[in-house]
Amino acid sequence: MNYASILEQIRGDLQPFLGTGKVADYIPELATVPADSFGMAIVTASGEIFRTGEADTRFSIQSISKLFACTLAFQLLGDALWERVGREPSGTAFNSLVQLESERGKPRNPFINAGALVVTDVLCRRFVQAETALVEFMRRLTGETSIDYDSRIAQSELQHAHRNRAMAHFMASFGNMEMPPEVVVDAYCRQCAISMSCVELAKAALFLTNHGVAPVTGERILDTSSAKRLSALMLTCGTYDAAGDFVYRVGLPAKSGVGGGIVAVLPGEMAACVWSPALDSNGNSAAGVLALEWLTTYTGQSIF
């Protein structure tokens, strides 16, 4: 497969669409990123790297961090994790509180904010600094020791985290928080503020294409069954309440973030990451979704 030429074709075709949408502005630091930025990378299961545009520019991974936080929590608890967070699509916005009342403080899945807060609570219970543990995990997955979180973005998020605090306190009232809500929200905002590039995120997700083993180090991250299950959750819940449309158009398990990144995996073949910060109405990168749709169209590769 000539991924290099396909990426260049996607980049050329995408030019009229760059900047379409709106950069996230409820986190002020994110609003400063140029809306027409674009990068895309593919890392194959054999370790080959293909890139186009600003594929080596680091950006705020935001909700993509939920995938890797969930991986760590799954390592720690196994299936016991699902006693505290569900595995169903929510059908509501990623920061909605609506279902928490009727479902007694158990979030629908680990990729909406409420579910990610429960996952972060698990990590805070296990690690002195959950966000540091996640940063170290990302460094191990990629071999890049300079990966870290952006303290300015973390502070910006903390100043505007009222809804996340409300969710954490609400779940605590149902007994689904073991650590103080403020500690959990602080760690959550810092993990969302991790900065990585398209190449680095594709490398990090590669274990999902390789039966749970990170090709960079040979480390087993998850057993084969757990890697399959985590990929299934990405497919059904990874792109907010647009997951059905995303699967229809793209046909790959993926996790998106309001920083404009989307990471996607094709088991046994490759991991891809695209970044373009202008978002559609669901909080997914508008150009990013289109780029991944064209990737599976031009290559003829998807899980279906």
Curated annotation (Swiss-Prot):
Molecular function terms, GO-annotated: glutaminase activity
Descriptive protein name: Glutaminase
Keywords, alphabetical: Hydrolase
EC assignment: 3.5.1.2
Annotated organism of origin: Paraburkholderia phytofirmans (strain DSM 17436 / LMG 22146 / PsJN)
Biological processes per GO annotation: glutamate biosynthetic process; glutamine catabolic process
Highest taxon above the source species: Bacteria
Catalytic reaction(s) noted: L-glutamine + H2O = L-glutamate + NH4(+)
Any coiled-coil regions, as ranges: none
Classification of source organism: Bacteria, Pseudomonadati, Pseudomonadota, Betaproteobacteria, Burkholderiales
Entries under SUPFAM superfamilies matching the protein: beta-lactamase/transpeptidase-like
Sites where the protein binds substrate: 63, 113, 157, 164, 188, 240, 258
Similarity annotation: Belongs to the glutaminase family.
Oligomeric and partner information: Homotetramer.
Listed InterPro entries: Beta-lactam/transpept-like (IPR012338), Glutaminase (IPR015868)
Keyword check for tRNA-binding: no
